[in-house]
Structures are given as structure tokens and as C-alpha cells.
């Protein structure tokens, strides 16, 4: 007798091949059989007639490092079919750190991860894992190279000394030994934006030739996106490692429809030459990150206190105005999205609550200031603890990336403690299947499922994940594709997706007829 028998469904097994009629049996947390099991019995039988049965969805790019400890965590994830997530992305992992620069690191991460509680601060990844509560979904972690650098050298612009590199390498090796699934870079963020390409290669020396994935938020994602792809291909070739480009996009209207075909061609050529490369994309034209991200690299030196002093200096602010106007060497989001395309989604000071959900342009009009002055004054008042939602990408580019065989779907979900998060926290998986598969026909259902399952599992080498096959982990979704509904909007983001008939995590029922069961059967996934 099996533990669970899912009868009569249409199985989209994660590989992208056409769906087929089959029963799926589960025993001991694993898939025990797939096929015609009409004579079999089980302790729990599900009728999946008229439904699609898929592997549990996988999001290898979230920022829930600290949110795992919040009451109610898991609802946003499970209701869209997620059974496995990976945190620590963009170089911004909540561990390991804990030295003299710990407070500065927590301040820097807060607009993205939310407040990191003191009990979660630890100088080892093993210590971080030990602090986690029972988990509703499976969770993996990347070693954030930005946090590793900040832990040994702070947020200074100076080139690292030999001793810094030795300390950085020890931390990286320890994190990998503790189970990090790979290494993440955030070259658009401090302090990694201070690296030259050669320095970056030196910093990553411990993973050379080790088949350890490197995921990358590239140095530029606007007009310089192709140069950034070229830089990362050079790094990956020299280190002989797998490369995965995070949230590939071309920011700015002038770049839409032009840069992404070039970038995809570069990645495909590298793949054809034998490199292990891939990329991912989120299914929205708006992103979300620190408002601080609008600043050029030289303005980020020294951490939040130094940034605030710099922004308060009239001469420095004038320099900033020229840098934003002239651009060059960084993603000039103020120009790429426009002040009317940058919205304030997380604020902390009571006096600023009136601006929540407003654009910088709207805030400026309310304050009778220029947009730059309003933005700088807000960053000063909030000590840079502001999250933005910025509209800067094109749906045609998203579709092109989705069509690439190299891509998978991610959310890049950020978890600010206050305010209005991006709706992608709640609906990325559902949006892919509802909008890009069902409404626009960019992908077949089977290909859409592959982008959510086997492809991300391959990217980070997640054994037993992403496929319906005998012996695989029993992370499963049952749903009617026509019934899926994203629900969340930019105005009302905190609405869980609808349409999941059942979601199983490790062979235990986590969602039943759209409702959470309260089961927490997730586990920590280690390399």
C-alpha cells in the first residue's frame, strides 16, 4: 500500500515533454511509481481528473533569508505552488557575518531582506541553519559574496589587502562546507561594485574548477547589459565554473527589444562552446530593491552613515545631479525608469507614511522640491532604509528570455518588514502560467512547468527536485491551469494566489483545496 495515490491526472513531469495521463504514487516522502496504477491502494487517494499534476515549483531567487522566522511565512509561497526556495541571492545573504561590520551589514540588507533579528546573526552558515524554525517549504542558501567581503573589510572603496583575501577565502570555504548551494554576486551593490574584474576573479578563487554554481546580479542591466554578460563569461571561463545570470533584463526604453536578443545570443554561443551557462527572469516589468540603488558606486562607499553625510553635503548633491544626468558606469535608474517610474514601497518614519505607494515625482510635487532633492532628503530621513518598485523593463524582453532554452523563472522576491512588497512575492509562478502560458501563449504548459521545476533544479544542482519520476522527492502540485489566479496587484500586493487543489512537500499535504493545512515538512537543502 502506498502513502498517497494521485489518480487520473495529466502529468506534466517537468522535462517539457507533452503531458501524459498517469497515476502518481508516493511512499516515504518519495515518488514510488508513475503510470497506470488502477489496481493500487493507498492511505490517501486524490482524484486528479481534469487536473494537471506537476513537480513542486522551485524559486532559486528569493530574499526570504530573515522572513523565514516571521509568523505566517509560507502562505505566499505554498499558495502559488512553491515547494522549494533558495535565498542568499545578489551577494546579499543574511549569513555568514557577525564581526565588527555586522550592524552595517544588517542596515544595508534591511530594504531587501527586512529586519534581520539579532538571534539570526551568526558568523557561520551552519549557525544560521541552526536558528531556523520548522519550515513550510524546502530552503537552500547561497553564500553571498557581497556580505562576505563586507564582513572582512566593510563597505570601503579601497582595494582589498592580501589579508582580506585570505579571510574572505576562509569564510567562503566554510560557507560551502556548511552546505551553501553556490555563490551569489551582486555587482550592482556595495561593496562588490568596487571590485575590478581581476579582483573579482581573485575573490572567487576557492571555487575555481569546483563545479560550484555562480549566480550573478550583473554590474549593469541597462545599456551596459551586454558588456556585463561579457565580463561574467570571462570570469566563468577563467574559473571554469557554471554561470547563472540572475534576473536578466534590459532596463530603459531605449534598450527594449535590442539588448536582450544580443545577450541571449552571447549566452547561447557560450553554451554551444561547452560552457555551463543559464539565466533566469521574473515575469514583471517592474523590479524592487533598495532606493539606494539609484546612486553611482562612489556614493555608496563607507556604509549608510557615510552615504547620509554625502547626500547632506550640497556640493556632493550637485555632483550627484551631474552623475545622474550624464550617466556612465552604473545603472542610472533615475533616468532608465524616470522619477515617475520609481515608487516608494517601504518606509519607516511616520512623517513619510504619506509617500507610501507614491512615485518620487509625486513626492517631489507634494514637497515642492526637485525629484532629486526629494529623493535625497527622504534617504537622509530614513537612513537609507527605503525599498522601491521601479518600472523599467519590457514584456517583449521577458517573453524572449522565457523562450530561451537557457532560462528559468524566478521571482526576486524581496521581504521588507514594513510597507507594500512587490506582488511577485505572492504571484510569480501563477503569473507565468496564467499570463505568459494561458493568455499570451509564449510557452506551452509543459514548457512553463519546466521553467518552474527541472530547469531551476538543474541550475543549482538540486538532487531529487523538479521532476516526476520514480525515486524523486514527493514535492507535487495538483491544479486546473484555467483556475489559476494571481490576485496580487501593485496597489494590493499581499494577496495569495488561487488555484492550487493540492500541494505536497516531501509527501505531506501542505495545501488542500486552496487552504493551508499547517503542515511544515520542508527541509534545509545543502550542497
Regions found by a protein language model. Give the residues of each.
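Hydrophobic, small-residue-rich alpha-helical packing segments that form membrane-like cores
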Residues: 90-99, 111-238
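Active-site neighborhoods of metal-dependent hydrolases
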Residues: 128-162, 168-189, 237, 241-242, ...
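C-terminal cap of metal-dependent C-N hydrolases
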Residues: 9, 313, 400-406, 411-412, ...
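Acidic, glycine-enriched loop/beta-strand segments at the rims
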Residues: 11-23, 386-392, 397-398, 444-449, ...
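Histidine-rich, glycine-flanked metal-binding segment
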Residues: 1-56, 71
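Metal-associated gating/positioning segment near the N- to mid-region
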Residues: 38-40, 48-119, 222
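Divalent metal-coordination and catalytic microenvironments
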Residues: 9, 24, 29, 50, ...
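Short acidic, glycine/serine/threonine-rich loops at helix termini
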Residues: 95-102, 150-156, 197, 226-230, ...
Amino acid at each position: 500500500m502506498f502513502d498517497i495515490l494521485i489518480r487520473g491526472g495529466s502529468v506534466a513531469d517537468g522535462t517539457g515533454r507533452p503531458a501524459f495521463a498517469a497515476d502518481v504514487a508516493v511512499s516515504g516522502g518519495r515518488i514510488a511509481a508513475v503510470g497506470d496504477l488502477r489496481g493500487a491502494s493507498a492511505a490517501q487517494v486524490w482524484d486528479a481528473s481534469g487536473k494537471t499534476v506537476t513537480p513542486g515549483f522551485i524559486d532559486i531567487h528569493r530574499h526570504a533569508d530573515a522572513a523565514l522566522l516571521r509568523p505566517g511565512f509560507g502562505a505566499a509561497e505554498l499558495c502559488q505552488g512553491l515547494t522549494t526556495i533558495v535565498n542568499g541571492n545578489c551577494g546579499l545573504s543574511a549569513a555568514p557575518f557577525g564581526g565588527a561590520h555586522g550592524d552595517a551589514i544588517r542596515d544595508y540588507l534591511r530594504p531587501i531582506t527586512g529586519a534581520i533579528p539579532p538571534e539570526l546573526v551568526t558568523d557561520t552558515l551552519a549557525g544560521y541553519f541552526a536558528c531556523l524554525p520548522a519550515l513550510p517549504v524546502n530552503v537552500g542558501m547561497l553564500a553571498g559574496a557581497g556580505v562576505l567581503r563586507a564582513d572582512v573589510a566593510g563597505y570601503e572603496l579601497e582595494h582589498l589587502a592580501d589579508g582580506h583575501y585570505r579571510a574572505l577565502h576562509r569564510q567562503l570555504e566554510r560557507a560551502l562546507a556548511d552546505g551553501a548551494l553556490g555563490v551569489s554576486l551582486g555587482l550592482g551593490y556595495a561593496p562588490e561594485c568596487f571590485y575590478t574584474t581581476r579582483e573579482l576573479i581573485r575573490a572567487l578563487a576557492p571555487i575555481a574548477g569546483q563545479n560550484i554554481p555562480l549566480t550573478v546580479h550583473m554590474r549593469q542591466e541597462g545599456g551596459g547589459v551586454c558588456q556585463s554578460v561579457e565580463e561574467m563569461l570571462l570570469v566563468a571561463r577563467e574559473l571554469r565554473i557554471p554561470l547563472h545570470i540572475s534576473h536578466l533584463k534590459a532596463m530603459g526604453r531605449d534598450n527594449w527589444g535590442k539588448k536582450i536578443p544580443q545577450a541571449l545570443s552571447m549566452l547561447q554561443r557560450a553554451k554551444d562552446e561547452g560552457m555551463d551557462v543559464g539565466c533566469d527572469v521574473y515575469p514583471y516589468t517592474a523590479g524592487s530593491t533598495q532606493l539606494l540603488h539609484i546612486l553611482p558606486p562612489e556614493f555608496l562607499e563607507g556604509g549608510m552613515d557615510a552615504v547620509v553625510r554625502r547626500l547632506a553635503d550640497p556640493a556632493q548633491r550637485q555632483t550627484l545631479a551631474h552623475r545622474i544626468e550624464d550617466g556612465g558606469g552604473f545603472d542610472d535608474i533615475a533616468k532608465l525608469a524616470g522619477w515617475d517610474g520609481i515608487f516608494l514601497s517601504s518606509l519607516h518614519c511616520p512623517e513619510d507614511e504619506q509617500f507610501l505607494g507614491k512615485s518620487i515625482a509625486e513626492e517631489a510635487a507634494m514637497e515642492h522640491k526637485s525629484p532629486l532633492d526629494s529623493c535625497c532628503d527622504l534617504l537622509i530621513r530614513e537612513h537609507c532604509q527605503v525599498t522601491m518598485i521601479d518600472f523599467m523593463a519590457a514584456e517583449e524582453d521577458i517573453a524572449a528570455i522565457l523562450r530561451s532554452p537557457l532560462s528559468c523563472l524566478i521571482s526576486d522576491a524581496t521581504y521588507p518588514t514594513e510597507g507594500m512588497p512587490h506582488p511577485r512575492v505572492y504571484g510569480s509562478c501563477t503569473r507565468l502560467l496564467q499570463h505568459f502560458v494561458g493568455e499570451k501563449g509564449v510557452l506551452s504548459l509543459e514548457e512553463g512547468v519546466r521553467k518552474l521545476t527541472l530547469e531551476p533544479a538543474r541550475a543549482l544542482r538540486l538532487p531529487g527536485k523538479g521532476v516526476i519520476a520514480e525515486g524523486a522527492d514527493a514535492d507535487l502540485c495538483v491544479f486546473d491551469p484555467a483556475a489559476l489566479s494571481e490576485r496580487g496587484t501593485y496597489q494590493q500586493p499581499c494577496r495569495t494566489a488561487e488555484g492550487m487543489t493540492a500541494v505536497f512537500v516531501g509527501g505531506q499535504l501542505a495545501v488542500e483545496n486552496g487552504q493551508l493545512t499547517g503542515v511544515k515538512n520542508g527541509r534545509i537543502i545543502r550542497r
